[in-house]
Each structure stands twice: as C-alpha cells, then as structure tokens.
C-alpha cells in the first residue's frame, strides 16, 4: 500500500507540473499578439476531434490490455507473447475504418463548419495523423501500465507533451516557423512521447511484439471479443461526452467560443489529477488480483 501511495504522489506531482506548463501555454495561446482566438480554438477543436477518432478506433483494446496481461505473461514466453501485436492489429483495423468514415463524411464536416470555423475545414485532414499518434501512444501506455510504468506515462502525457507544445509555441512566436508548420508539429506531439515510451520499454527488454496467434489468444478468444465489444461502446460514449460541447460550439458559433470553453475545461480538469494518478498506478494491481 505504501508503494501505491508513493507512486500516486509522484504521478500527481508530474500531472500538476504539466498543468503549470499548460497554464503558460494557454497564456501564450491567448495573447492576441501571437495567436488569434480562432487559431487557439483550432488547436483545441483539432485535439478533441483527434481524441474522438482515437477513441472510436481503439475498439476497446486498452481494456483488453489491462485485463488480460497477467494471463499472457504467466503462460507465454516473451517472444511468443502476441498481446501487444493483437492490440495493434485491432487498433489499426479500427483506425483504417474510422479514417474511411471520416473521408466519406468530409462534405458534411465542410457544410457544418465552413461558415463559422473555416480554419477547422482548412486543417481537417490533420485529424488523421494526430488521431493515429494518440492511438499508438494509448495502446502502448495501456501495455506499459502492467510493468508499473504509471509514473512514467503520467510524466510523458501530462508534462512532456505540454513542454513540447511550449517549445513549438516559442518557435512560432520567434518567427522561426509559420503557423502551418506549427500545426504540423502540433499534430505529432503524441508521436514524440510514443517513441520515448517505446524506446524505454525496448531498452528494458519489455517490448514484445508478435503477430503469430498464441494459445492464450485462442483459449480466450470469445472473452476477448466480448470485452472489446462492450468497452468499445463505453469508450465511445465517454469520448463523445467529453468532445461534443466544443465541437458544437465550433460548428454553431465559431472557434473563438470553442477556445473559451476549452480554457474553462482546462481549469476544471485540474481537479481530476489525483484520480488520474490513482488509475495509472492501480490498474496492474487490479489486473493481477482479477486473475489470481
């Protein structure tokens, strides 16, 4: 229990450090000398849409990784562990399906957003690479939880991402990069932390990727499909709930109002920091207890 408390406090510290950096980012974003309100609203709306695409693409693989990791770890040699490979295959299938749907729906998006949020229409296709980067990180993050990497992932997604954003904001303010280049780098922020996390797991010999179907997958096939189907619906509702407000504002009013709403949401999210740190630390313990 003491280890849980210590790790939770460390994760919470990194989360609040990230919020401090995020506050600096928001200040710079909202300074009209450097960014317009519409440009700030674009970054928030683009992130919300990318999160929505990621949530729908994941098809519940994060819950699969949480629940079944002990079964794979206890019954398979590392080189035969196909859990991460299976999760990546399911997520890739979901992402291809969602990207296709997004392409088909582009005329609808243009019709809904072109009048009040033309910037979002201009950068519409940036949703795809950003959503894919977020998806990759979330899959690897869920996998890494089982190795006790909750503190590390809290640092990466709460602190390092915001520091990376701060760096590219400064580059934009200094005139080193254009706004378009800024947006291109902005879409890759989760790719950066995915690479860092993958490198750390690889260096510690914990990054096992096999695409050959194992006996554990065959044995639990029906249960795996059931948990993927159920959690896909839960994740869809959760992501839609968190994204719909700012997207409706961008569609019906403008990106400026979406930016104001995003700022209020950012302030409210500060209260969730302890909860997020507890979740990151306790997931592997609950997974092991569920199996045993």
Question: PLM features: residue spans?
Answer:
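Interhelical loop/hinge segments that connect adjacent transmembrane helices in multipass membrane
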Residues: 1-5, 175-186, 197-242, 285-292
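Signature of the first transmembrane helix
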Residues: 3-65, 99, 103, 130, ...
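Membrane-interface junctions at transmembrane-helix termini in multi-pass inner-membrane proteins
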Residues: 5, 133-156
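Membrane-water interface segments that mark the loop-to-transmembrane alpha-helix transition
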Residues: 6-18, 45-46, 59-107, 122-125, ...
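Residue-level recognition of pore/gate-forming positions within transmembrane alpha-helices
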Residues: 15, 19, 48-51, 86, ...
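Alpha-helical transmembrane segments of multi-pass membrane proteins
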Residues: 52-53, 100, 115-140, 226
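Helix-loop junctions and terminal segments of transmembrane helices
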Residues: 59-74, 146, 264, 268-292
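Hydrophobic alpha-helical transmembrane segments
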Residues: 125, 155-205, 265
């Amino acid at each position: 229990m003491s280890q849980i408390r210590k790790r939770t406090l460390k994760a919470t510290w990194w989360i609040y450090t990230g919020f401090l950096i995020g506050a600096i980012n928001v200040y710079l974003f909202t300074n009209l000398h450097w960014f317009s309100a519409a440009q700030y609203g674009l970054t928030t709306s683009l992130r919300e849409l990318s999160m929505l695409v990621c949530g729908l693409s994941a098809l519940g693989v994060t819950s699969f990784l949480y629940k079944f990791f002990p079964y794979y770890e206890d019954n398979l040699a590392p080189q035969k562990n196909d859990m991460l490979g299976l999760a990546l295959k399911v997520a890739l299938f979901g992402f291809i399906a969602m990207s296709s749907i997004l392409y088909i729906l582009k005329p609808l998006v243009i019709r809904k957003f072109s009048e009040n949020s033309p910037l979002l229409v201009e950068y519409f296709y940036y949703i795809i690479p950003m959503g894919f980067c977020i998806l990759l990180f979330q899959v690897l993050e869920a996998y890494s939880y089982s190795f006790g990497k909750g503190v590390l992932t809290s640092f990466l997604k709460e602190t390092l991402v915001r520091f990376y954003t701060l760096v590219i904001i400064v580059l934009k303010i200094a005139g080193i990069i254009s706004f378009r280049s800024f947006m291109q780098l902005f879409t890759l922020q989760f790719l950066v932390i995915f690479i860092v996390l993958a490198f750390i797991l690889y260096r510690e010999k914990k990054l096992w990727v096999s695409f050959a179907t194992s006996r554990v997958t065959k044995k639990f096939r029906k249960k795996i499909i059931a948990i993927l189907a159920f959690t896909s619906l839960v994740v869809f509702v959760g992501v839609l709930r968190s994204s719909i407000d700012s997207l409706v504002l961008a569609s019906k009013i403008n990106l400026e109002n979406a930016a104001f709403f995003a700022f209020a949401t950012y302030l409210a999210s500060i209260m969730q920091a302890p909860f997020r740190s507890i979740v990151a630390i306790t997931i592997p313990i609950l997974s092991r207890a569920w199996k045993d």
